[in-house]
Amino acid sequence: DPNRDWGWGWQPNYIQNGAYKYPFSLPENRAIMEFVMKHPNIAAAQSYHNAGGMILRGPGGQEDVNTYNAQDVAVYDAIAKKGEELIPGYKYLVVYKDLYSAYGGELDWFYAGRGIYTYSNELWTPYLMFMREGTRDPFDNKTYDFDRYLLFQDAFVPWKEYDHPQYGKIEVGGFKKNFGRAHPGFLLESDAHRNMAFTIYHCYHTPKLKISEVKERDLGDGLKEITATVANERLMPTHSSQDVKNKIEVPDYITINTTAKVLAGIQVENADLNQTTEQKNNPQTIAVPNIPGLGTITVKWIVQGNAPYTVTVNSKKGGVASSK
């Protein structure tokens, strides 16, 4: 099973059915892993499976629950709840809690291993047959009716007698093996479009940074204080909690480019209470561990001189933005 081959929480086949030789022993998975490792700007990922009508997130095992903090869960929830609206009949679920324990899964490697917000979409759901939930009623003929009235019996092979060399007289027939696992043709385009729309919505909420405000204050004696506020206009932070905790990616850097002398670089934690932290080394470029989704970070510099300047933020996942 390619989805039991990823290098997080991997277990051998006698524990996790479907596991192969070792993590990333399948060349296709290894190629994806190597691509992701070479592209630290990747902030979001989705993979498509079948079937079940689900939008899944990790963790696959209960032991990894603590890899997700409340802020990350809030991001996952907000995006996936919109997915439930965009794709009727799909349910947002957590693998270990709502399905079963799964080890070596793609979801876990992307998020826990790389700090990337990731979903798996389980394509196709019986809800799409008649736009209503299924039941466990043994007399519910929804599947039969769907084949009869909408597929014109294309999914069902009539039973017929067959002379089996070992078992003698038997009957063969019934529903085709792909029925219930993949979309009938006329429903494929619609569901593919809706899943694509959800993927684009997910992508839209990857970090987008801008310098929202720059202001100056004269301190006298040729000194001035320059304060810059960097805003993230999307739901995802520049670093997930797993990323920050394990220092997976480098910090975001906010730099003042000027010929004036930069005497101090300071991160503002609470402007109202005047709580700040000075960066002792290289004050011109302030390293911040994370810029929160739909939030801001404020920094300031003490500068000697009156030269022009440009403020730039450089983030692996949030891109580059500047203001003069």
Which stretches of residues belong to each language-model region?
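Non-catalytic terminal regions with compositionally biased, polar/charged low complexity
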Residues: 223, 235-237, 320-322
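Short, contiguous acidic/charged loop-to-helix segments that flank catalytic cores in large enzymes
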Residues: 186, 242-244, 288-291
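Short amphipathic, basic-aromatic surface patches that mediate peripheral association
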Residues: 230-245
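Extended low-complexity, serine/threonine- and proline-enriched intrinsically disordered segments
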Residues: 243-261
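A structural signal for short secondary-structure junctions
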Residues: 40, 111-115, 218-222, 246-248, ...
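Metallocarboxypeptidase
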Residues: 1-217, 224-225, 229-234, 257-283
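Residue-level recognition of well-ordered beta-strand positions that form the cores
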Residues: 122, 229-231, 255, 300-302, ...
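Low-complexity, intrinsically disordered segments enriched in Ser/Thr together with acidic residues
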Residues: 284-324
